[in-house]
Amino acid sequence: MFTMKKSLLLVFFLGTIALSLCEEERGADDDNGGEITDEEIKRGILTDTLKGAAKNVAGVLLDKLKCKITGGC
């Protein structure tokens, strides 16, 4: 149970970081007139990768939780 709490906390933490990065990028776009640089594109790819990984981890954790609750897998 403790490891599941740690995993969920990690997923929440990564989601919060991704959200704050998006807000910072949105503010930066306003400053430079909306131009998109190569660095911003790379950040977007990294953010999408992190979001996908977080969704996969959350799905696996939910499946394990469902198995524990129902009592059979």
Swiss-Prot record:
It is found in: Secreted. Its main location: secreted. Residues 23-41 form a propeptide. GO terms for biological process: defense response. Keywords: Amphibian defense peptide, Antimicrobial, Cleavage on pair of basic residues, Disulfide bond, Secreted, Signal. The keyword Secreted applies. Disulfide bonds join 67-73. GO terms for cellular component: extracellular region. Residues 1-22 form the signal peptide. Pfam families: Antimicrobial_2 (PF08023), FSAP_sig_propep (PF03032). Expressed by the skin glands. Antimicrobial peptide. Belongs to the frog skin active peptide (FSAP) family. Brevinin subfamily. This is Pelophylaxin-1.
